[in-house]
Amino acid sequence: MDNSDLRGRLEFIQETEKLKDVLRSAHTAQGRQESTPEHTWRLCLMAMIFQDQLPGLDFERVLKICVIHDLGEALHGDVPAVRQTARHNKSADERNDLITLLAALPAPLQRNLLALWDDYENAVSP
């Protein structure tokens, strides 16, 4: 890996860290507003707990999709369903934000991660 590639990967990680500050409309059991990474962590944990009940799934792919599915929210936050309007295209906005975040990465990795997000958004995988 050359220095430019390494810098791009580190830049991506730094930019996606903004996700830690994104709050969702959901709340924890204690009543505190949940962050997007907390939501993602719980989703990954649920996937692990139910993995044995879904033996036909590609578990590695499932976990990757869990991690990537809300990454675009790092730039403009979460838009809860109750705040969406007919004019607002949450999917397109999040995809564009994800593309912006991925820009620092090598092209093959960009394509791979965007394909995972598209898989999630279009419900391609079982």
Could you describe each region identified by the protein language model?
Residues 1-126:
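Alpha-helical, largely C-terminal catalytic domains
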